[in-house]
Amino acid sequence: MFVALLTAISSFADGKYVVIDGLRFFVRTDTKEAILFDNSYSGNITVPEKITDEGVEYTVTSFANGCFSNCKSLTSVSIPSSVTSIGSWCFAYCEELKSITIPSSVTSLGEVCF
């Protein structure tokens, strides 16, 4: 159990949170992946396929659990083809959401995603 805990801590330590163009990501420095995280999003959101932080490029591969949850004035989301998974409760309680573009690259949708 101690080894598993150290592994989990090590995995989390290999990254950091960044905000790029109003979108909050956790970037994994080991795999060069970016995970979209929660924030107070509103209006029309276009998630980029790649982001750059401090000269390093990261590919956006997933949306964290609840990343858009309770964003009551979110109206549309465009998801890039680099994304393969969308977490649980990702779009829950988005009362004004009228349009979402989900590419065929998304192979995993979490529970109660909408």
What kind of region is each of these model predictions?
Residues 1-8:
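Bacterial N-terminal signal peptides
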Residues 11-15, 20:
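Boundary at the C-terminal end of the N-terminal hydrophobic targeting segment
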Residues 19-31:
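Short, ordered beta-strand-loop transition motifs
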Residues 20-23, 40-62, 71-85, 94-108:
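Structural signature of tandem-repeat unit edges
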Residues 29-44:
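Secondary-structure transition/turn motif
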Residues 108-114:
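Short, intrinsically disordered, charge-balanced linker/junction segments flanking boundaries
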